[in-house]
């Protein structure tokens, strides 16, 4: 599947917020001024308030880029979320959080979602003891995710673990960083996820 391979800082500046596309080795401010619009005139340009549609579109783009998903696949996630019981917006976030690459990232085995996706694609990840190389694979409750033996000494994994130790461990995951494995205990509740995401704007956009 095609992926965006351009400058990640440009995407963050376009959305005006940290999309968590870079590792936490340095602060985002030292790498990318998210308050400045991209382009040669970005330093002097003003971020306009925008229309209702514009705000909805930007929110969709922001979430899509946070999880590293292209438009066609994002629409499929939305369609699936709308067919489930409950809040469509919360269902959408749940589907995104249950992606294998995202769970690998949340467990601290990859310093970014892009790196976690690469670990999955390169067959470095085991799901319940079996190799799964599909980043979009939906993880279920009580599934065990672990690092394949031959990949455990990769420097990028060790660096990611060092960064993970500096942050709070998600409550919906049971992680053993020494054994390089973890269990997906439950689908995270909405209040356990970022409050910066306004999923209702995405629902409004696709409901038009």
Swiss-Prot record:
**Organism, scientific name:** Ruthia magnifica subsp. Calyptogena magnifica
**A GO biological-process term:** translation
Acyltransferase listed as a keyword: no
The identity of this protein, by name, is Small ribosomal subunit protein uS4
Q: Which GO terms describe its molecular function?
A: rRNA binding; structural constituent of ribosome
Subunit structure, as described in the record: Part of the 30S ribosomal subunit. Contacts protein S5. The interaction surface between S4 and S5 is involved in control of translational fidelity.
Q: Which Pfam families match?
A: Ribosomal_S4, S4
UniProt xrefs under InterPro entries? Ribosomal_uS4, Ribosomal_uS4_bac-type, Ribosomal_uS4_CS, Ribosomal_uS4_N, S4_RNA-bd, S4_RNA-bd_sf
- Any keyword Electron transport? no
Per UniProt, residues of the S4 RNA-binding domain are 98-160
Its GO CC terms are: small ribosomal subunit
SMART domains per UniProt: Ribosomal_S4 (SM01390), S4 (SM00363)
Q: In terms of domain of life, where is this protein from?
A: Bacteria
